[in-house]
Protein backbone atom coordinates (compact mmCIF):
# COMPACT_ATOMS: atom_id res chain seq x y z
CA UNK A 1 0.00 0.00 0.00
CA UNK A 2 2.80 2.42 0.92
CA UNK A 3 4.60 1.64 -2.36
CA UNK A 4 1.41 2.42 -4.32
CA UNK A 5 0.96 5.76 -2.53
CA UNK A 6 4.63 6.59 -3.15
CA UNK A 7 4.19 5.97 -6.87
CA UNK A 8 0.95 7.98 -7.00
CA UNK A 9 2.31 11.04 -5.16
CA UNK A 10 5.72 11.04 -6.87
CA UNK A 11 7.92 13.94 -5.70
CA UNK A 12 5.29 14.95 -3.10
CA UNK A 13 5.72 11.64 -1.26
CA UNK A 14 8.42 12.81 1.23
CA UNK A 15 6.25 15.80 2.23
CA UNK A 16 3.14 13.64 2.63
CA UNK A 17 5.04 10.98 4.59
CA UNK A 18 6.47 13.56 7.00
CA UNK A 19 3.03 15.11 7.49
CA UNK A 20 1.64 11.68 8.34
CA UNK A 21 4.41 11.13 10.89
CA UNK A 22 3.74 14.56 12.43
CA UNK A 23 0.02 13.74 12.74
CA UNK A 24 0.89 10.34 14.24
CA UNK A 25 2.84 12.10 17.01
CA UNK A 26 0.79 15.28 17.58
CA UNK A 27 -2.60 13.49 17.55
CA UNK A 28 -1.86 11.07 20.42
CA UNK A 29 0.03 13.85 22.23
CA UNK A 30 -3.03 16.10 22.24
CA UNK A 31 -5.11 13.16 23.48
CA UNK A 32 -2.56 12.55 26.24
CA UNK A 33 -2.63 16.24 27.18
CA UNK A 34 -6.44 16.20 27.40
CA UNK A 35 -6.56 13.11 29.59
CA UNK A 36 -3.65 14.27 31.74
CA UNK A 37 -5.94 17.09 32.89
CA UNK A 38 -8.55 14.48 33.85
CA UNK A 39 -5.91 12.32 35.57
CA UNK A 40 -4.77 15.36 37.55
CA UNK A 41 -8.25 16.12 38.80
CA UNK A 42 -8.91 12.45 39.62
CA UNK A 43 -5.58 11.87 41.40
CA UNK A 44 -5.80 15.07 43.44
CA UNK A 45 -9.44 14.28 44.22
CA UNK A 46 -8.41 10.83 45.51
CA UNK A 47 -5.68 12.38 47.67
CA UNK A 48 -8.23 14.82 49.11
CA UNK A 49 -10.77 12.02 49.72
CA UNK A 50 -13.26 13.09 47.07
CA UNK A 51 -14.29 11.68 43.69
CA UNK A 52 -13.19 14.26 41.15
CA UNK A 53 -15.08 14.67 37.81
CA UNK A 54 -17.63 11.85 37.50
CA UNK A 55 -20.64 13.20 35.58
CA UNK A 56 -19.69 13.30 31.88
CA UNK A 57 -19.45 9.79 30.46
CA UNK A 58 -18.55 6.66 32.41
CA UNK A 59 -16.84 7.80 35.64
CA UNK A 60 -16.09 11.17 34.02
CA UNK A 61 -14.05 9.78 31.09
CA UNK A 62 -15.59 12.28 28.64
CA UNK A 63 -14.86 15.31 30.84
CA UNK A 64 -11.88 16.50 28.69
CA UNK A 65 -14.11 16.51 25.59
CA UNK A 66 -16.77 18.52 27.42
CA UNK A 67 -14.13 21.00 28.61
CA UNK A 68 -12.78 21.33 25.05
CA UNK A 69 -16.23 22.01 23.59
CA UNK A 70 -16.95 24.55 26.34
CA UNK A 71 -13.72 26.46 25.65
CA UNK A 72 -14.29 26.41 21.88
CA UNK A 73 -17.71 28.00 22.38
CA UNK A 74 -16.39 30.80 24.58
CA UNK A 75 -15.54 34.17 23.08
CA UNK A 76 -11.91 35.29 22.87
CA UNK A 77 -12.09 38.78 24.37
CA UNK A 78 -9.22 41.06 23.35
CA UNK A 79 -8.74 44.12 25.61
CA UNK A 80 -9.24 47.40 23.75
CA UNK A 81 -5.76 48.66 24.68
CA UNK A 82 -4.01 45.39 23.79
CA UNK A 83 -1.83 44.83 20.73
CA UNK A 84 -4.18 42.49 18.84
CA UNK A 85 -1.62 40.69 16.64
CA UNK A 86 0.87 40.04 19.43
CA UNK A 87 -1.94 39.18 21.85
CA UNK A 88 -3.00 36.31 19.57
CA UNK A 89 0.60 35.40 18.71
CA UNK A 90 1.49 34.76 22.38
CA UNK A 91 -0.42 31.47 22.76
CA UNK A 92 0.93 30.24 19.39
CA UNK A 93 4.52 30.93 20.45
CA UNK A 94 3.85 29.10 23.72
CA UNK A 95 2.52 25.87 22.19
CA UNK A 96 4.54 25.67 18.94
CA UNK A 97 7.91 24.87 20.61
CA UNK A 98 6.18 22.41 22.97
CA UNK A 99 5.00 20.45 19.91
CA UNK A 100 8.08 20.98 17.71
CA UNK A 101 10.40 19.50 20.35
CA UNK A 102 8.76 16.08 19.86
CA UNK A 103 10.28 15.82 16.37
CA UNK A 104 13.48 14.24 17.76
CA UNK A 105 12.02 12.20 20.63
CA UNK A 106 12.58 8.45 19.99
CA UNK A 107 9.91 6.01 21.20
CA UNK A 108 12.11 3.06 20.26
CA UNK A 109 15.04 2.41 17.92
CA UNK A 110 13.05 3.14 14.75
CA UNK A 111 10.00 5.14 15.89
CA UNK A 112 11.30 8.71 15.67
CA UNK A 113 10.36 11.57 13.34
CA UNK A 114 13.89 12.98 12.89
CA UNK A 115 16.82 10.93 14.19
CA UNK A 116 19.42 13.71 14.35
CA UNK A 117 22.75 13.59 16.18
CA UNK A 118 22.08 16.87 18.01
CA UNK A 119 18.67 15.82 19.35
CA UNK A 120 19.33 16.85 22.95
CA UNK A 121 20.59 20.27 21.86
CA UNK A 122 17.49 20.70 19.66
CA UNK A 123 15.13 19.95 22.57
CA UNK A 124 16.94 22.41 24.85
CA UNK A 125 16.67 25.05 22.11
CA UNK A 126 12.94 24.43 21.63
CA UNK A 127 12.17 24.57 25.35
CA UNK A 128 14.04 27.89 25.51
CA UNK A 129 11.86 29.46 22.80
CA UNK A 130 8.66 28.96 24.84
CA UNK A 131 9.57 31.85 27.14
CA UNK A 132 8.99 34.31 24.26
CA UNK A 133 5.30 33.36 24.18
CA UNK A 134 5.05 34.18 27.89
CA UNK A 135 6.77 37.57 27.55
CA UNK A 136 4.79 38.57 24.44
CA UNK A 137 1.48 37.53 26.06
CA UNK A 138 2.20 39.65 29.13
CA UNK A 139 3.43 42.66 27.19
CA UNK A 140 0.71 42.60 24.49
CA UNK A 141 -2.07 42.47 27.12
CA UNK A 142 -1.17 46.08 28.08
CA UNK A 143 -1.89 45.27 31.72
CA UNK A 144 0.55 45.87 34.56
CA UNK A 145 -0.60 42.66 36.26
CA UNK A 146 -0.08 40.51 33.16
CA UNK A 147 3.29 42.12 32.46
CA UNK A 148 4.49 41.60 36.03
CA UNK A 149 3.40 37.96 35.86
CA UNK A 150 5.23 37.54 32.55
CA UNK A 151 8.46 38.97 33.96
CA UNK A 152 8.33 36.72 37.01
CA UNK A 153 7.53 33.67 34.90
CA UNK A 154 10.28 34.42 32.37
CA UNK A 155 12.87 34.91 35.13
CA UNK A 156 11.87 31.61 36.74
CA UNK A 157 11.97 29.68 33.46
CA UNK A 158 15.37 31.06 32.48
CA UNK A 159 16.81 30.41 35.96
CA UNK A 160 15.79 26.76 36.13
CA UNK A 161 16.63 26.16 32.49
CA UNK A 162 20.31 26.69 33.38
CA UNK A 163 20.20 24.08 36.16
CA UNK A 164 18.25 21.68 33.92
CA UNK A 165 20.77 22.11 31.09
CA UNK A 166 23.72 21.53 33.42
CA UNK A 167 22.04 18.36 34.75
CA UNK A 168 21.82 17.02 31.20
CA UNK A 169 25.51 17.82 30.58
CA UNK A 170 26.32 14.97 32.97
CA UNK A 171 24.30 12.59 30.79
CA UNK A 172 26.06 13.92 27.69
CA UNK A 173 29.45 13.23 29.31
CA UNK A 174 28.47 9.69 30.30
CA UNK A 175 26.90 8.72 26.95
CA UNK A 176 29.36 10.73 24.83
CA UNK A 177 26.53 11.62 22.44
CA UNK A 178 23.76 14.17 21.86
CA UNK A 179 21.62 11.62 20.00
CA UNK A 180 18.73 10.57 22.24
CA UNK A 181 18.59 7.05 20.82
CA UNK A 182 22.30 6.49 21.45
CA UNK A 183 21.95 7.85 24.99
CA UNK A 184 19.24 5.24 25.67
CA UNK A 185 21.34 2.42 24.16
CA UNK A 186 24.29 3.48 26.33
CA UNK A 187 22.16 2.48 29.35
CA UNK A 188 21.70 -1.13 28.17
CA UNK A 189 22.15 -3.85 30.77
CA UNK A 190 19.23 -3.45 33.14
CA UNK A 191 18.01 -1.27 36.00
CA UNK A 192 21.41 -0.78 37.67
CA UNK A 193 23.03 0.38 34.41
CA UNK A 194 20.66 3.32 33.94
CA UNK A 195 22.07 6.80 34.56
CA UNK A 196 19.82 7.56 37.54
CA UNK A 197 22.29 5.77 39.81
CA UNK A 198 25.70 7.33 38.97
CA UNK A 199 24.07 10.69 38.20
CA UNK A 200 21.50 10.63 41.02
CA UNK A 201 22.07 14.25 42.21
CA UNK A 202 21.72 15.44 38.59
CA UNK A 203 18.53 13.38 38.18
CA UNK A 204 16.97 15.00 41.27
CA UNK A 205 18.03 18.50 40.17
CA UNK A 206 16.74 17.86 36.64
CA UNK A 207 13.34 16.67 37.81
CA UNK A 208 12.75 19.48 40.32
CA UNK A 209 13.98 22.02 37.74
CA UNK A 210 11.56 20.51 35.21
CA UNK A 211 8.69 21.07 37.67
CA UNK A 212 9.76 24.71 38.05
CA UNK A 213 10.37 25.11 34.30
CA UNK A 214 6.80 24.06 33.52
CA UNK A 215 5.37 26.44 36.17
CA UNK A 216 3.87 23.58 38.17
CA UNK A 217 3.15 23.55 41.91
CA UNK A 218 4.89 24.23 44.23
CA UNK A 219 6.69 26.59 41.81
CA UNK A 220 3.55 28.08 40.21
CA UNK A 221 3.94 31.60 41.60
CA UNK A 222 3.48 33.04 38.10
CA UNK A 223 -0.09 31.73 38.05
CA UNK A 224 -0.81 31.54 41.81
CA UNK A 225 -4.47 30.75 41.22
CA UNK A 226 -5.39 30.96 44.91
CA UNK A 227 -3.60 34.31 45.35
CA UNK A 228 -3.09 36.39 42.19
CA UNK A 229 -5.54 34.68 39.79
CA UNK A 230 -3.66 34.04 36.55
CA UNK A 231 -0.34 35.82 36.06
CA UNK A 232 0.62 36.56 32.48
CA UNK A 233 -2.60 35.16 30.96
CA UNK A 234 -4.96 37.13 33.20
CA UNK A 235 -6.48 38.93 30.16
CA UNK A 236 -6.99 35.75 28.08
CA UNK A 237 -10.25 33.86 27.66
CA UNK A 238 -11.73 31.06 25.58
CA UNK A 239 -9.48 28.95 23.39
CA UNK A 240 -6.59 31.44 23.59
CA UNK A 241 -6.54 30.83 27.35
CA UNK A 242 -6.78 27.05 26.84
CA UNK A 243 -3.78 27.00 24.48
CA UNK A 244 -1.50 28.15 27.32
CA UNK A 245 -2.64 25.20 29.39
CA UNK A 246 -2.23 22.83 26.45
CA UNK A 247 1.37 24.08 26.18
CA UNK A 248 1.91 23.61 29.93
CA UNK A 249 0.71 20.00 29.91
CA UNK A 250 2.54 19.21 26.65
CA UNK A 251 5.73 20.51 28.30
CA UNK A 252 5.04 18.37 31.36
CA UNK A 253 4.87 15.24 29.20
CA UNK A 254 7.97 16.36 27.27
CA UNK A 255 10.18 16.85 30.34
CA UNK A 256 8.93 13.56 31.83
CA UNK A 257 9.74 11.81 28.54
CA UNK A 258 13.20 13.40 28.50
CA UNK A 259 13.82 12.24 32.09
CA UNK A 260 12.80 8.69 31.15
CA UNK A 261 15.16 8.72 28.14
CA UNK A 262 18.11 10.39 29.88
CA UNK A 263 18.08 8.72 33.30
CA UNK A 264 15.69 5.74 33.28
CA UNK A 265 16.73 3.78 30.21
CA UNK A 266 13.91 4.88 27.88
CA UNK A 267 12.25 1.85 26.28
CA UNK A 268 14.81 -0.58 27.77
CA UNK A 269 13.56 -3.29 30.11
CA UNK A 270 14.69 -3.08 33.77
CA UNK A 271 15.51 -6.82 33.78
CA UNK A 272 17.30 -8.81 31.04
CA UNK A 273 14.69 -11.58 30.77
CA UNK A 274 11.88 -9.19 29.72
CA UNK A 275 11.89 -7.68 26.20
CA UNK A 276 12.46 -3.98 25.51
CA UNK A 277 9.25 -2.20 24.54
CA UNK A 278 7.66 1.20 24.08
CA UNK A 279 5.36 0.16 26.94
CA UNK A 280 8.29 0.45 29.36
CA UNK A 281 8.85 4.02 28.17
CA UNK A 282 5.17 4.94 28.57
CA UNK A 283 5.10 3.39 32.05
CA UNK A 284 8.15 5.41 33.15
CA UNK A 285 6.66 8.64 31.77
CA UNK A 286 3.33 7.95 33.53
CA UNK A 287 5.17 7.31 36.82
CA UNK A 288 7.08 10.60 36.54
CA UNK A 289 3.89 12.50 35.66
CA UNK A 290 2.28 11.05 38.78
CA UNK A 291 4.96 12.84 40.83
CA UNK A 292 3.96 16.15 39.17
CA UNK A 293 0.39 15.59 40.38
CA UNK A 294 1.51 14.36 43.80
CA UNK A 295 3.60 17.50 44.32
CA UNK A 296 0.63 19.72 43.51
CA UNK A 297 -1.61 17.93 46.01
CA UNK A 298 1.04 17.87 48.76
CA UNK A 299 3.32 20.92 48.88
CA UNK A 300 2.43 24.55 49.62
CA UNK A 301 3.51 27.19 47.12
CA UNK A 302 6.98 28.68 47.58
CA UNK A 303 7.55 32.41 47.78
CA UNK A 304 9.13 33.91 44.67
CA UNK A 305 12.40 34.77 46.44
CA UNK A 306 12.66 31.20 47.77
CA UNK A 307 12.24 29.80 44.26
CA UNK A 308 14.96 32.02 42.81
CA UNK A 309 17.31 31.29 45.71
CA UNK A 310 16.84 27.53 45.24
CA UNK A 311 17.66 27.78 41.54
CA UNK A 312 20.69 30.06 41.70
CA UNK A 313 22.25 29.22 45.09
CA UNK A 314 21.53 25.49 45.35
CA UNK A 315 20.81 23.75 42.05
CA UNK A 316 23.34 25.45 39.78
CA UNK A 317 26.26 24.96 42.25
CA UNK A 318 25.23 21.31 42.86
CA UNK A 319 25.14 20.52 39.14
CA UNK A 320 28.50 22.22 38.52
CA UNK A 321 30.15 20.31 41.37
CA UNK A 322 28.74 16.98 40.18
CA UNK A 323 29.80 17.64 36.58
CA UNK A 324 33.35 18.29 37.82
CA UNK A 325 33.17 15.12 39.93
CA UNK A 326 31.99 13.02 36.97
CA UNK A 327 34.70 14.51 34.75
CA UNK A 328 37.38 13.76 37.36
CA UNK A 329 36.13 10.20 37.92
CA UNK A 330 36.26 9.54 34.18
CA UNK A 331 40.04 9.99 34.34
CA UNK A 332 40.42 7.25 36.98
CA UNK A 333 40.04 3.46 37.05
CA UNK A 334 36.40 3.93 38.19
CA UNK A 335 35.42 5.56 34.89
CA UNK A 336 33.34 2.48 33.97
CA UNK A 337 30.80 3.45 36.67
CA UNK A 338 29.78 6.50 34.61
CA UNK A 339 29.57 4.91 31.14
Swiss-Prot record:
Q: Which reaction does it catalyse?
A: a quinone + NADH + 5 H(+)(in) = a quinol + NAD(+) + 4 H(+)(out)
Q: Looking at the record's lineage, which domain of life comes first?
A: Bacteria
Compartment(s) = Cell inner membrane
What membrane topology is given?
A: Multi-pass membrane protein
Residue runs in coiled coils: none
Question: Main site of residence?
Answer: membrane
Q: Does Ubl conjugation count among this protein's keywords?
A: no
Q: What is its EC number?
A: 7.1.1.-
Q: Which GO terms describe its molecular function?
A: NADH dehydrogenase activity; oxidoreductase activity, acting on NAD(P)H, quinone or similar compound as acceptor; quinone binding
What biological process terms from GO does the record include?
Answer: aerobic respiration
Q: Name one GO cellular component term.
A: plasma membrane
Alphabetically ordered keywords of this record: Cell inner membrane, Cell membrane, Membrane, NAD, Quinone, Translocase, Transmembrane, Transmembrane helix, Ubiquinone
| TM segment ranges | 19-39, 87-107, 120-140, 153-173, 191-211, 253-273, 275-295, 310-330
Enzyme superclass (EC): translocase
Q: How does it assemble?
A: NDH-1 is composed of 14 different subunits. Subunits NuoA, H, J, K, L, M, N constitute the membrane sector of the complex.
Task: Name the job this protein performs.
Answer: NDH-1 shuttles electrons from NADH, via FMN and iron-sulfur (Fe-S) centers, to quinones in the respiratory chain. The immediate electron acceptor for the enzyme in this species is believed to be ubiquinone. Couples the redox reaction to proton translocation (for every two electrons transferred, four hydrogen ions are translocated across the cytoplasmic membrane), and thus conserves the redox energy in a proton gradient. This subunit may bind ubiquinone.
The Swiss-Prot or TrEMBL record describes its family as follows: Belongs to the complex I subunit 1 family.
What is this protein identified as?
NADH-quinone oxidoreductase subunit H
Protein species of origin: Methylobacillus flagellatus (strain ATCC 51484 / DSM 6875 / VKM B-1610 / KT)
Give the lineage: Bacteria, Pseudomonadati, Pseudomonadota, Betaproteobacteria, Nitrosomonadales
> Which gene is transcribed and translated to give this protein?
nuoH
Amino acid sequence: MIAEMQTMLGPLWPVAWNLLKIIAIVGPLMGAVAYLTLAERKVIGFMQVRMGPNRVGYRGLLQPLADGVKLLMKEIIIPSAASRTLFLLGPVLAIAPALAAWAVVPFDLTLVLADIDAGLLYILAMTSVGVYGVIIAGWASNSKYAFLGAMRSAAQIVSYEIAMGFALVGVLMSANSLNLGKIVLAQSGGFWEWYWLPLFPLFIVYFISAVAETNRAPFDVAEGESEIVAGFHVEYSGMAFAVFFLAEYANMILVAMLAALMFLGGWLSPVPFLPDSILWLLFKVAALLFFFLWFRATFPRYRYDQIMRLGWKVFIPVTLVWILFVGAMMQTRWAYLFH
